[in-house]
Amino acid sequence: MSLDIAKYPTLALAENPEELRMLPKESLPKLCDELRQYLLTCVSRSSGHFASGLGVVELTVALHYVYNTPFDHLIWDVGHQAYPHKILTGRRDRISTIRQKDGLHPFPWRGESEYDVLSVGHSSTSISAGLGMAVAAEREGKGRRTVCVIGDGAITAGMAFEAMSHAGDIHSDMLVILNDNEMSISENVGGLNNHLAQLLSGKLYASLREGGKKAFSALPPIKDLLKRTEEHLKGMVVPSTLFEELGFNYIGPVDGHDVHTLTQTLKNMRDLKGPQLLHIMTKKGKGYAPAEKDPIGWHAVPKFDPASGTLPKSQSSLPTYSKIFGEWLCETAAKDSKLMAVTPAMREGSGMVRFSREYPQQYFDVAIAEQHAVTFAAGLAIGGYKPVVAIYSTFLQRAYDQLIHDVAIQNLPVLFAIDRGGLVGADGQTHQGAFDLSFMRCIPNMVIMAPSDENECRQMLYTGYHHNGPAAVRYPRGNGTSAVLEPLEMLPIGKGVLRREGEKIAILCFGTLLAQAQLAAENLNATLVDMRFVKPLDEELVLEMAAKHQVLVTVEENAIMGGAGSGVNELLMAKRRWVPVLNIGLPDLFVPQGEQDEMRSELGLDAAGIQRQIEAWLA
């Protein structure tokens, strides 16, 4: 799909930042309007992250206009908002391929463009990486500048504050731009603050400020008085105290949709020494009324008709696993007031909207703080409550030490509802749930369950919730299989289920690839086992299958290395059972983006691929 660039005459003149910087500043508002419309048209035809990009159009234009990218380093935290950046950095004609197999990466990606200096996807990493680049630039001595753009959600994470504390301590030259799009820090936006921001970022103010510090450095009482006076004056109109205490010079807030003010402020700040923080106020979804009204709903969108102002409903009548979890959560809370649900800023994605409204006293959104979420849950468990941590597989990686040190070592009854296990699709390498079975399986005291359908998912959630120790239920992104939902009951811990009896080959399946493995088993006349438990492994059943069959095949949507299949290998070797085993799962690579079914087919994890791998191995 390509758009007629003639409909965007100003944007047509800015194929890359070098061309952008040749435009007169008077044309920048027109460029922003066209860029926003181009983004709307592209995403509506191809799907993708939407509202975040609309909110940073003016900022993106101003940054590339003022800074000498790619020589100067521009870092986008998370990367949802980087579509305008990609459009302006030579990728305009390919933007419609974003998040698709073999298309543009969903986030800034080092291998894709020299303008993407940091590969991202997870939040709150930009300031740490930016500080490292700033230190390297100082050692390089070529005047390279470093700019980090971070949102008001991502900046709440501990890692961001750790980085700012370090930056303030070593006084490196860098600019952090706080993109505040939810009015959560300050509402002081207007002409006075825009004027003040330009004044405070100007060379005269900076020279007076630094000169005053030097002149009175030998007179502590006067120096302290000047500092208090400055903070008092700034504090009247800006929330600077926190960032100043961390060692940053605070400028703002600035209207993030006034491209001329942004450009002038950035020019003023470009050569300032030490760590600087520019606070801008933006509207997520800016320029498209439905997205402005519901920025969460329009965060990531399928193809849609811009004229209708509505998103198409899912064509599947089957509930998602996230919804299955959310319904179970409400069902359980209705019977047990001890249930406490914890999520690190993933309420919508984890299916917890209904629960948060119906049981607000039992619901905790701890923001982007995965480490805190897990240890907070440990504290709830110690206090006699029954915490359920709803978290994506890829984000649980960020709390691995807490999982071990604060939960598992103490054998605390915390249930982990791990969403997005396995291949997640369009978000690519940074979001695949490829490693959770591997990194959890080695932790003592853990019970790890992998359901084959939505009914098993419910039963496992119930089992894990009532288990007196740490437990994890790991389920995929996507819809269920129309399985009949049976009454909830405790599953016997560490026991699998024989689904089909065959000959010679026994397929041991962990998780929702069971339906694909079933088709392969029927074509191969193989035995099929729904293993259910990754840990503790059903050793008796595995050894029985080894005794009755010539070969074993393990199937899982997790990294082969260290995964469930590795557990089968370890058991057989420990018991001296010399049975050949084929492990089928995710290979030793970071799986790129693509539709889930596309990637399963490419990796040999659909029915045909499983059968093909087995036949090739036996040949």
Curated annotation (Swiss-Prot):
Does the record bear Cell cycle in its keywords? no
Q: Which GO terms describe its biological process?
A: 1-deoxy-D-xylulose 5-phosphate biosynthetic process; isopentenyl diphosphate biosynthetic process, methylerythritol 4-phosphate pathway; terpenoid biosynthetic process; thiamine biosynthetic process
Q: Which cofactor does it need?
A: Mg(2+); thiamine diphosphate
What is the UniProt remark on how the cofactor binds and its stoichiometry?
A: Binds 1 Mg(2+) ion per subunit. Binds 1 thiamine pyrophosphate per subunit.
Cite the binding residues for thiamine diphosphate.
80, 121-123, 153-154, 181, 288, 370
Task: Show the Pfam families listed in the entry.
Answer: DXP_synthase_N (PF13292), Transket_pyr (PF02779), Transketolase_C (PF02780)
Q: What is its EC number?
A: 2.2.1.7
Q: Which InterPro entries match?
A: Dxylulose-5-P_synthase, THDP-binding, Transketo_C/PFOR_II, Transketolase-like_Pyr-bd, Transketolase_BS, Transketolase_C, Transketolase_CS
Q: Name one GO molecular function term.
A: 1-deoxy-D-xylulose-5-phosphate synthase activity
Alphabetized UniProt keyword annotations: Isoprene biosynthesis, Magnesium, Metal-binding, Thiamine biosynthesis, Thiamine pyrophosphate, Transferase
Q: What is the similarity comment for this entry? A: Belongs to the transketolase family. DXPS subfamily.
Q: What does this protein do?
A: Catalyzes the acyloin condensation reaction between C atoms 2 and 3 of pyruvate and glyceraldehyde 3-phosphate to yield 1-deoxy-D-xylulose-5-phosphate (DXP).
Please identify the protein, giving its name as recorded. 1-deoxy-D-xylulose-5-phosphate synthase
Tell me which species this is from.
Answer: Yersinia pseudotuberculosis serotype O:1b (strain IP 31758)
